[in-house]
Amino acid sequence: MYGQVDEWVGAQKFPGGKTAVQVSGGGMSTSYWGLKGAEDLGNGYKAIFTLEGFFRAQNGQYGRFTGDTTFSRNAYVGIESPYGTVTAGRLTTHLFVSTILFNPFIDSYVFSPMVYHVYLGLGTFPTYSTDQGVTGDSGWNNAVQYQSPNFNGLSASAMYALGNTTQNGAKKWSGQVLYFHGPFAATAVYQYVNFNNSPGDLGSFDSSGVPGLKAQSVAQLGVSYDLKYVKLFGQYMYTHNDQTLTSWHVNTAQGGVSVPFGPGTVMASYAYSRDGGGFDQTRQTAAVGYDYPLSRRTDIYAAYLYDHISNQSSGNTYGVGLRAKF
């Protein structure tokens, strides 16, 4: 068994809302636990499986939110071979991998500006509405994926998620190329989601908040370069949405740095999104934080995030947290 527990204490104010002081989970990373295994089949082949589920340590409940499934992080079986790996089940999407690898706050749903713009940017939230983000979850149900072997740092993968229905709803596909070479890394991702008003992948966030939304295509590029004294991050994303009567697009960019400072790391990131043909909104989000390792598996952190959507009051989030891996 393996996983991590992340808890933070602080205050959060979404754009257009009021400040709430809270003890909550997943400040820097969402808490989860997992099981995995492999069986050697001979001749370079292995049978593999992974089961991973999120939980909320602040109240002892499973899932990221009420209604989330038990193994919403990953749940799959597969075959590894010299020719690549094939897996089937609920799989982490290529876009999520690209999003978290090329921003300094990685997968934080509390302090990462890029995660805000990608996964908290489409729909009606408690205090604001926006049409700029990506539909669906960080994982796809009913999915099949092929991942190539690594060729001198270069790898590619393709995924298709069946809708398990006679209609077009929830059918999705994506492809990704990743490259790692010394201090340099890069990625390119494309994903397409075709659905009937609701993508069916994110429980309480199921509704897109945009009536008549039929399909969405997303392309994202990411790069990073580690200069030792500073690591640079950059991302660009183009999102195209097809609605029943019209369409609109969104341009998103993110730049960030992580700087070693003492035994820990200073992180800073800024993301900007602007849409055309939809709500005609602009969104600017910036964050700064410091992560301090207490041991190889435990760290503490402090961070602040500023979030502004045009024509709404700004949001602010700040807090300190503890993360322990096991």
Can you say where each PLM-predicted feature lies in the sequence?
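Outer membrane beta-barrel
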Residues: M1-A11, A20-L162, G169-K171, L178-A185
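Transmembrane beta-barrel strands of outer-membrane/channel proteins
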Residues: G3-V9, L51-G53, R90, A158-Y160, ...
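Gram-negative outer-membrane beta-barrel proteins
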Residues: V9-G17, F55-Q61, H94-S98, N164-N168, ...
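Transmembrane beta-barrel outer-membrane domains
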Residues: S24-T30, G67-T70, D137-G139, T166-K172, ...
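Outer-membrane beta-barrel architecture
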Residues: G34-K36, Y76-G78, Q145-Q147, Q176-L178, ...
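Repeated loop/turn-to-beta-strand initiation elements of outer-membrane beta-barrel proteins
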Residues: Y45-A47, Y83-T87, G153-A156, P183-A188, ...
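Detector for outer-membrane/organellar transmembrane beta-barrel domains
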Residues: S174-A287
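Outer-membrane beta-barrel "beta-signal"
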Residues: S314-F326
